[in-house]
Amino acid sequence: MDMISYRLKEQELEEITKRLQEYKNSLLLDLVVLMDDGGRLVSFAPYVDSYKPIAQRVALVGAAVVGAVDQLEHVISSKKSMFFSGQEKNMYVHMLSHKFMLASVFNHKVPLGSVKLFKEKLSRELTTLLENALARGESRVVRFEDLAL
């Protein structure tokens, strides 16, 4: 079981999704995923049903990788982001706060510097919305079985 210590209002979730879509479109990214530290999908862009299973996997695996690397980094140094390079696509994962992460999946033609630059503006916008959700302090329990893979 896991505890969720935030609750997003419908209008906040719509605003988050809108901003993720704008970020995705501004850089021609393939996928943008906002997740929490428990691997739960908060929102994603493009917001199309066919992308939801992929976004859920990115959220779950992304949070696990960030958690594992975080434990290793206590030995070396502290970082707030990770970059993964594949044959055709790259992924940049950035910690927005101690609770939320943003993953950007993009083609090699998109410069990493542009992703980082545009991510800074998005991070500031999202952090305000997410801090409001955390401030409400509503906790609920989620069973692992409830997470759809």
Please provide the spans of the model-predicted regions.
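Acidic, low-complexity cytosolic segments
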Residues: 1-31, 38-149
